């Protein structure tokens, strides 16, 4: 919640803001109501006296928590993330709620590899696949979408699991028209939902669960094609159902050109993964790499 206008606070915000017009840390904390004008003055005094950074001084005085500092820094560096419970997204979205943890560091490393090996090579779409239910494909797709959006890439996450969709739950989007409705010609591009908490992220939910998902995904005469999305987004990630349960993941990967396979430690059989790779190759798609889910 923003602070009510106060001349002293306004003066401090001016003092705390750099000349290039970008609000600095102190101004952001004032604007967010985490600091009062009097508190900011105390911070400035301690900062000068002990040669501290503004955030360090504010924490030392007990005026803000470390979480408040991290939130302000995320705004200052255009790196959005959420406080626990904010936006009511699923707790599995660790990239949104725990952006500085070890899991998210690994996600960022994976993002870098995908940028180098796939997206900078002219590709825009990638299928996220798994062998078994519970291997973590939906988890990986959702969190990768968040970290790509944090990089500034215009990112679209498509829930192409038309059997047991999860992304509408993870992003708290409810049951709304989605991919299945678009493929059936009952919805258009307006079914794509922007996620306000992440400026560069949009989600297309699965929509109504159809009785014939494989046939719907395979239709050559579909009114909507991936090329239509590629005009508006830099990165398109497609979540798919387990390959052991259906051929849907291979069908989707054939359209996207490549797949990233999620393997669950002590759970996924290597023979099944090899069979999936063979099916991909037969469909003209590439296996870009594998990710071992240890959680």
Regions found by a protein language model. Give the residues of each.
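P-loop NTP-binding module
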Residues: 1-50, 60-295
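The conserved glycine-aromatic submotif of the RRM
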Residues: 52-54
């Amino acid at each position: 919640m923003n602070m009510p206008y106060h001349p002293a606070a306004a003066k401090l915000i001016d003092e705390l803001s750099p000349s290039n017009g970008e609000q600095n840390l102190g101004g952001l904390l004032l604007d967010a109501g985490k600091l009062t004008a009097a508190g900011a003055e105390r911070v400035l005094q301690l900062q000068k006296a002990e040669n501290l950074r503004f955030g360090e001084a504010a924490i030392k005085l007990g005026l803000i928590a470390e979480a408040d500092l991290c939130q302000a820094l995320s705004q200052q560096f255009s790196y959005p993330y959420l406080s626990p419970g904010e936006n009511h997204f699923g707790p599995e979205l660790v990239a949104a709620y725990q952006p500085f943890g070890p899991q998210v560091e690994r996600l960022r490393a994976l993002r870098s590899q995908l940028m180098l090996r796939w997206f900078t090579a002219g590709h825009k779409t990638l299928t996220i696949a798994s062998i078994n239910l519970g291997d973590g494909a939906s988890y990986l797709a959702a969190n990768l979408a968040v970290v790509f959006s944090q990089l500034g890439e215009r990112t679209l996450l498509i829930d192409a699991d038309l059997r047991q969709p999860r992304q509408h739950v993870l992003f708290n989007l409810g049951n709304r028209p989605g991919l299945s409705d678009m493929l059936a010609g009952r919805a258009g591009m307006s079914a794509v939902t922007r996620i306000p908490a992440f400026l560069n992220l949009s989600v297309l939910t699965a929509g109504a669960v159809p009785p014939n998902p494989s046939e719907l995904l395979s239709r050559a005469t579909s009114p909507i094609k991936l090329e239509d999305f590629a005009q508006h987004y830099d990165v398109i990630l497609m979540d798919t159902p387990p390959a052991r349960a259906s051929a849907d993941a291979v069908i989707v990967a054939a359209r996207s050109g490549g797949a990233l396979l999620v393997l669950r430690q002590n759970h996924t059989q290597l023979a099944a993964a090899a069979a999936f790779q063979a099916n991909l190759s037969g469909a003209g798609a590439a296996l870009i790499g594998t990710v071992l889910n240890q959680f």
